[in-house]
C-alpha cells in the first residue's frame, strides 16, 4: 500500500494512507513558506501537536473545530488548548497522553516520545506513528539529538524519519544525520529549515553528513507544498 506525504513547510506535514490522514504541527498562518491555506488542505482525521509554540500549534484549533478531527498532545498542553477554544471532546484520550504512552485513533497507533526543547505548556514531545497499513514514521518535533533515539530505533521499524536540521533551536545537520543512524531509519525528510533567516537555509550540509553517518538512509529533499508517494514494499522508494 502507498503512503502520501505532503510537506507544508517548517515542521508541518500531512501523511495519508489506508484512507486515513494525519496532520502534524499545522503552522499555516504566519508561515512564510506555506504554499496553501489551512482551510484548503485535505481533511485530516487526526492532528498532532508536538509542543506549545506558535510555529507548531499553528491553526490546530481552527482545523479541528472545522473538521471534527481529534487533536493529540501531551497532558498539560491539552488544558492550554481547551482554554484557547478547542472543544474538550476533540482532545484525543480526553486529556491527552504522555511520553512512552500509545493511543489509537482512526486505525492509527501513536506513541509519544521525549524531545529536548521547550514549551509554553506541558513538555515538548515527538511521535512514532504507525498507519493502518503498517507504514511507520517518526516526527521528532523540535529537539536536540539524544542517545535514547537508539532505543526507539530498536523498538520500532521506522520507515521514515522527519527530523529538524535547522540548528540554533534544534539539531543541526550533523546531529540530525547521526540521529538517522541511531534510529535505523530507512528514509528521512529534513524539516525546520529555511523558514526563517536564522535557520539552516538548505539541505546541502545534511546530505553530506548523512553520507558519513547513515549512508543507507535515503534522503528525500522536499519543497514546501510538495507531495511524494512511498511504497513500503519497495524499500521506501518514491513511486
Curated annotation (Swiss-Prot):
SMART domains: Lactamase_B. It comes from the Bacteria. InterPro entries: Metallo-B-lactamas (IPR001279), RibonucZ/Hydroxyglut_hydro (IPR036866), UPF0173 (IPR022877), UPF0173_UPF0282_UlaG_hydrolase (IPR050114). It holds the Pfam family Lactamase_B_2. Keywords: Hydrolase. Gene3D superfamilies: Ribonuclease Z/Hydroxyacylglutathione hydrolase-like (3.60.15.10). GO terms for molecular function: hydrolase activity. PANTHER family: UPF0173 METAL-DEPENDENT HYDROLASE MJ1163, UPF0173 METAL-DEPENDENT HYDROLASE MJ1163-RELATED. Belongs to the UPF0173 family. HAMAP family: UPF0173. NCBIfam families: PRK00685.1. This is UPF0173 metal-dependent hydrolase Dvul_0081. It comes from Nitratidesulfovibrio vulgaris (strain DP4). The lineage of its organism: Bacteria, Pseudomonadati, Thermodesulfobacteriota, Desulfovibrionia, Desulfovibrionales.
Amino acid at each position: 500500500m502507498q503512503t502520501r506525504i505532503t510537506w507544508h513547510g517548517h515542521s508541518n506535514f500531512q501523511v495519508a494512507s489506508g484512507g486515513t490522514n494525519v496532520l502534524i504541527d499545522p503552522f499555516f498562518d504566519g508561515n512564510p513558506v506555506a504554499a496553501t491555506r489551512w482551510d484548503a488542505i485535505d481533511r485530516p482525521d487526526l492532528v498532532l501537536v508536538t509542543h506549545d509554540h506558535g510555529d507548531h500549534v499553528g491553526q490546530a484549533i481552527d482545523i479541528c473545530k472545522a473538521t471534527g478531527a481529534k487533536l493529540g498532545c501531551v497532558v498539560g498542553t491539552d488544558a492550554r488548548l481547551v482554554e484557547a477554544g478547542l472543544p474538550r471532546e476533540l482532545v484525543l484520550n480526553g486529556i491527552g497522553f504522555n511520553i512512552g504512552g500509545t493511543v489509537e485513533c482512526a486505525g492509527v497507533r501513536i506513541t509519544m516520545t521525549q524531545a529536548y526543547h521547550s514549551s509554553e505548556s506541558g513538555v515538548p514531545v515527538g511521535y512514532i506513528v504507525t498507519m493502518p497499513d503498517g507504514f511507520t514514521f517518526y516526527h521528532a518535533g523540535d529537539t536536540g539529538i539524544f542517545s535514547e533515539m537508539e532505543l526507539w530505533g530498536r523498538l520500532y521499524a521506522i520507515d521514515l524519519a522527519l527530523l529538524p536540521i535547522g540548528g540554533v533551536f534544534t539539531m543541526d545537520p550533523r546531529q540530525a544525520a547521526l540521529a538517522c543512524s541511531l534510529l535505523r531509519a530507512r528514509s528521512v525528510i529534513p524539516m525546520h529549515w529555511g523558514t526563517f533567516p536564522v535557520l539552516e537555509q538548505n539541505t546541502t550540509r545534511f546530505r553530506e553528513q548523512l553520507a558519513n553517518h547513515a549512508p543507507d538512509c535515503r534522503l528525500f529533499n522536499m519543497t514546501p507544498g510538495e507531495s511524494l508517494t512511498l511504497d513500503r514494499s519497495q524499500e521506501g522508494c518514491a513511486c
